[in-house]
């Protein structure tokens, strides 16, 4: 065994994990490369965009900035662990509100939304937008994301029925002009959809550009 590797033990999405890792490995890389949890995305790799957001002992953190050895003996929750029995209310609200577009920022946004509603059951629009400040979205202008969190808030507080989340095709069968569920929205909201950097295959080669 490589003498430079260190042993870590942690719990990820409720499951105990024991691995030997390089001390310099970041938590985001550990989740993606060692555990194949591709829902944790890497965007800026500098702690700015929030696509790599996870919960560490219940606190929202950017996993690209945290050495995995700092997470030793911690409990980690990723997007894959949010909806343990299918999609969570928050994930379903993102789909319903049209907050899932390209989907790359979606897992991090849902992790942030989960934290917001866990810490305050009645956040207003101003607080929601402020608390999303660490997560960047290129597509939506945040309007649909805020609407999704407001919808989840109302459902979780029983101010609105979860029945509104059911996907309904208009009686006419015509969908033009109607809001319907995107065909890949569930995969994006669950963090399961593969992007280029998520794809792996046996004996795959890696190229590093040197300038």
Put a short name on every predicted segment:
Residues 1-164:
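Signature of N-terminal electron-transfer/Fe-S-associated modules in redox systems
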Residues 154-211:
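Flexible, low-hydrophobicity surface segments
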């Amino acid at each position: 065994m490589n003498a430079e590797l260190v042993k870590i033990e942690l719990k990820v999405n409720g499951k105990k994990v024991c691995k030997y890792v390089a001390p310099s490995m970041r938590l985001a890389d550990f989740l993606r490369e060692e555990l194949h949890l591709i829902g944790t995305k890497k965007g800026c790799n500098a702690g700015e965009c929030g696509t790599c957001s996870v919960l560490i002992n219940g606190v929202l953190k950017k996993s690209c900035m945290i050495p995995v050895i700092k997470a030793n003996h911690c409990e980690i929750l990723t997007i894959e662990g949010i909806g343990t029995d299918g999609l969570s209310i928050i994930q379903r609200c993102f789909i319903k509100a049209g907050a899932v577009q390209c989907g790359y920022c979606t897992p991090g946004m849902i992790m942030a939304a989960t934290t917001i509603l866990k810490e305050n059951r009645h956040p207003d629009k101003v607080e929601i937008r402020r608390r999303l400040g660490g997560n960047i979205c290129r597509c939506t202008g945040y309007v649909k994301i805020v609407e999704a969190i407001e919808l989840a808030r109302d459902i979780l507080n029983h101010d609105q029925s979860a029945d509104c989340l059911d996907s309904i095709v208009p009686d006419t069968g015509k969908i033009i002009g109607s809001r319907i569920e995107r065909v890949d929205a569930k995969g994006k909201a669950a963090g399961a959809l593969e992007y280029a950097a998520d794809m792996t295959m046996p004996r795959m080669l890696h190229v590093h550009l040197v300038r």
